[in-house]
Curated annotation (Swiss-Prot):
UniProt comment concerning the protein's domains: The N-terminal ATPase-like domain seems to have lost ATPase activity, but may still bind nucleotides. The C-terminal Toprim (topoisomerase/primase) domain probably has the endonuclease activity, but when expressed alone (residues 348-578) has not activity, showing it requires the N-terminal ATPase-like domain for function.
Name the record gives this protein: Endonuclease GajA
Keywords recorded for this protein, A-Z: Antiviral defense, Endonuclease, Host-virus interaction, Hydrolase, Magnesium, Metal-binding, Nuclease
Assembly information from the UniProt record: Homotetramer. Forms the core of the anti-phage defense complex. Interacts with GajB; 2 GajB dimers dock at opposite sides of the GajA complex to form a 4:4 GajA-GajB assembly (GajAB). GajAB interacts with Bacillus phage Phi3T Gad1 protein; this interaction forms a 4:4:8 GajAB-Gad1 complex and leads to GajAB inhibition.
Binding-site positions, ATP: D32, I33, G34, K35, T36
Site (Interaction with GajB): residue numbering on this chain: K94, R97
pH-activity relationship: Optimum pH is 9.0.
Length: 578
C-alpha cells in the first residue's frame, strides 16, 4: 500500500490543495501557515477519536458553510501480491474495490454544514472509481475504516504520565495467565498484606485511624471504622508502577524528569503499542514538531529512527528542525506556503545511489535551505566565507528575511535545484566558468562551467574544444592562457549567458577570484601585500580567503555587494539597491 495523493477542499485555511504523497512525508513551512491543519485533515479522515466530534463552523474555509468540506485520499494498491498491508485493506473493503481500476483506491470525506444543528456531519465513502464511491459501512462512530487503520497522533507536548496510565492496563494484562508469573504474583500479594499489617501497627497510623473514625461517627451514626491501606493492596501492584531510568553499571534509579528524556520514552511506548496492541492494523504516525524539548543530538537520533526503522512505515511529520531531516531518503517533502492563498508544493526526495556515501552531507546542507524563501547555491567554503562577511556588513538580517547560502560541495547543483524548484523555493546560482582537460586527449577541454549551467536548464552539453598551448608554457603562464580563452568563450556564448541570468544563474567570466579582483582589486593587493592577489589567493584558496575576509573593511563589503559581478547577492536579499 502506498499513499499517493490527498485533495483538501474548504477546510480551515485550505481553499483547495492537491498534494502528492508517499509513505514517509515531511511537512514544513512558516508558523501558522497550515501544517497542523494538514495533519488534522488526515485525522478527520482516518481517526475516529477526532471524527466523532464532527465539524464546527470555524472548520470551514473562511467560515463559508455554503460549500462542503471535502478530503479525498488516494492509495496505490498495485503491490497487492507482495504487501501485507495492502492485503489487510483489501480484505476489509471487499466489494468497494472493483477489478476495472483495482490498483487505485479512494477514501473520501465530505461534510455539509447544518445551520439548524450548528454542526457539520461527516459522511465517509470509498471505492476504486472516484465518481462512483460507496458509503463506508459502520455503526455509530465506528466504521470499517477503523478496523484497518490506526492513527497514532503524537502531540509536540506529549504527556508521558497520561500515555503510560492510559495504556497500563493493556500492557500488564498481557502477563495475566502467564504461568511463570503466577507464583511471583502470589508472593507479591502476600508481601503486600504484610506491608499493610505493619502499616496498621504503627502508632501514628493507629492514632489517626481512631480519631478520624470518631470524627466520622460524630457526623454519621454508622458502625464503620476508617483504616489506612496501601493502594497496592486494593488496586493491585501494577497501579503503583511508573517508569524510571537506570544507567548501565549504576545501581541507582533516576526519575524521567527531563522533558527530552520523557519525550523519547513516550515515543518508545508508542512504538511498543504499534507492535503489540495494533499489530493487526495499518499504523499511521502523525507526528507534530517533535523537536520541541529535544536536544540537537536527540533530534538527529530520532531522524535515524524515523527514516530507517520499519516501525515508522507510514508517517506524516511536521517540523521546523533541519536536524530531523539528516537521514531522509525516499521521502515526500511537502512545503506549505502562502502568497494570496495557502498552497502546497511537494517533491519526492531520493538520494541517488551514486551519492549514497555522502547522503548525510547532502541532506545536512539541504535541510536548512528548505526553510528559506530564497537560496543562493555556491560551490564551496571560500565563497561561503566571503559572502557571509559581505552580507553581515551590508544586509545582516538576510536570513531573518528568508535568505540562505547553500554550499553544494563542488558540483552537486542538480541534486539541490530539482528539490528547491519543485518546492517553489527561489534558487540563485553562482558558479565558475571552469574548463576541464580530457584525460588522454592533449589540448582538449570540456566546457565544464557552461555545461553545468546548460544542464540546469535541461540542455545538452556543448562540444569539447581544443586549446593549443605549447608544452614549454606551464604553471602561471598556462593559467593566464586558459583564462584568456575563458573570456573568449564567455563572449562567444553571450546569448546563453543572457539566458542564464534570466534563470538566476550567474556564471563568472573566469572565476570567483577574478570577479573579486574586479570589485576590490586594490584592497586585495593591500591586504595580501602582493601585486598579483588573484594568484596569491588561488595558491591556498580557503586559507587565504580567511585572511582576506578578516581584513575587509565595510567599504570593501559594499563595493563587492554593489558590483555587477556579484549581482547574485542582491538577488538573494531581494535588494533594489542601485
Amino acid at each position: 500500500m502506498k499513499f499517493s495523493n490527498i485533495t483538501i477542499k474548504n477546510f480551515r485555511n485550505f481553499e483547495k490543495v492537491n498534494i502528492n504523497l508517499d509513505n514517509k512525508n515531511v511537512i514544513f513551512g512558516m508558523n501558522d501557515i497550515g501544517k497542523t491543519n494538514f495533519l488534522y485533515a488526515l485525522r478527520f479522515l482516518l481517526d475516529k477519536e477526532i471524527r466523532k466530534f464532527g465539524f464546527n463552523k470555524s472548520d470551514y474555509h473562511k467560515h463559508d458553510t455554503s460549500k462542503k468540506i471535502e478530503i479525498i485520499l488516494t492509495l496505490d494498491l498495485s503491490n497487492y501480491e507482495k504487501d501485507e498491508d495492502t492485503k489487510k485493506l483489501i480484505s476489509v473493503v471487499k466489494g468497494a474495490r472493483t477489478s476495472a481500476n483495482a490498483d487505485v483506491f479512494y477514501i473520501a470525506l465530505e461534510s455539509k454544514y447544518d445551520d439548524k444543528e450548528l454542526y457539520g456531519n461527516i459522511i465517509l465513502k470509498w471505492g476504486s472509481e472516484l465518481d462512483n464511491l460507496i458509503d463506508i459501512p459502520g455503526r455509530g462512530n465506528i466504521n470499517a475504516l477503523d478496523n484497518v487503520f490506526k492513527v497514532i497522533y503524537i502531540n509536540p507536548l506529549v504527556d508521558l504520565d497520561k500515555l503510560f496510565a492510559q495504556n497500563k492496563k493493556y500492557i500488564f494484562e498481557e502477563s495475566q495467565g502467564n504461568e511463570s508469573d503466577e507464583g511471583i504474583l502470589n508472593n507479591i500479594k502476600s508481601l503486600t498484606d504484610q506491608v499493610n499489617q505493619q502499616i496498621g501497627e504503627m502508632t501514628i497510623i493507629k492514632g489517626f485511624q481512631q480519631e478520624i473514625t470518631s470524627e466520622y461517627r460524630s457526623l454519621k451514626k454508622e458502625e464503620v471504622s476508617i483504616e489506612l491501606k496501601s493502594e497496592m493492596a486494593i488496586k493491585g501492584f501494577f497501579s503503583d508502577i511508573i517508569p524510571y531510568i537506570k544507567k548501565d553499571g549504576d545501581s541507582n534509579y533516576y526519575p524521567t524528569s527531563g522533558d527530552g528524556r520523557r519525550k523519547m520514552l513516550s515515543y518508545s511506548i508508542y512504538n511498543y503499542l504499534a507492535k503489540k496492541k495494533y499489530e493487526d492494523k495499518i499504523v499511521i504516525y502523525l507526528i507534530e514538531e517533535p523537536e520541541i524539548s529535544l536536544h540537537r543530538s536527540m533530534q538527529i537520533a530520532l531522524s535515524k529512527q524515523l527514516f530507517e526503522q520499519s516501525t515508522y512505515k507510514y508517517f506524516f511529520l511536521s517540523t521546523h528542525s533541519p536536524e530531523l531531516l539528516y537521514e531522509m531518503d525516499n521521502t515526500r517533502l511537502i512545503r506549505v506556503h502562502s502568497t494570496e492563498k495557502v498552497v502546497c508544493s511537494s517533491h519526492m526526495y531520493n538520494v541517488e545511489e551514486a551519492y549514497g556515501s555522502v547522503k548525510k552531507k547532502l541532506n545536512k546542507a539541504l535541510s536548512s535551505a528548505l526553510f528559506a524563501e530564497r537560496v543562493l547555491l555556491i560551490e564551496g567554503p571560500s565563497e561561503k566565507i566571503l559572502f557571509e562577511k559581505v552580507l553581515d556588513e551590508v544586509e545582516p538580517e538576510y536570513e531573518l528575511n528568508g535568505g540562505f547560502l547553500l554550499e553544494v560541495g563542488g558540483t552537486y547543483f542538480n541534486h539541490y535545484v530539482c528539490t528547491l524548484n519543485d518546492l517553489g523555493i527561489t534558487h540563485i546560482i553562482k558558479t565558475d566558468n571552469d574548463l576541464k582537460s580530457k584525460k588522454g586527449k592533449k589540448g582538449v577541454y570540456e566546457l565544464l562551467g557552461l555545461n553545468r549551467c546548460l544542464n540546469l536548464l535541461g540542455r545538452e552539453n556543448l562540444d569539447e574544444i581544443t586549446i593549443d598551448i605549447p608544452e614549454d608554457i606551464k604553471g602561471k603562464k598556462k593559467k593566464e592562457r586558459l583564462n584568456e580563452r575563458k573570456k573568449e568563450i564567455f563572449k562567444q556564448y553571450k546569448n546563453e549567458v543572457g539566458e542564464f541570468l534570466g534563470e538566476r544563474i550567474y556564471l563568472s567570466e573566469i572565476d570567483l577570484e577574478n570577479d573579486l579582483y574586479s570589485a576590490i582589486g586594490e584592497s586585495m593587493k593591500r591586504i595580501f601585500e602582493n601585486e598579483d592577489p588573484v594568484h596569491y589567493l588561488q595558491k591556498s584558496k580557503l586559507f587565504n580567503m580567511v585572511e582576506l575576509v578578516n581584513n575587509l573593511s565595510t567599504k570593501d563589503c559594499f563595493d563587492v555587494f554593489e558590483h555587477e559581478k556579484f549581482a547574485c547577492l542582491k538577488e538573494l536579499v531581494g535588494s533594489d539597491r542601485g
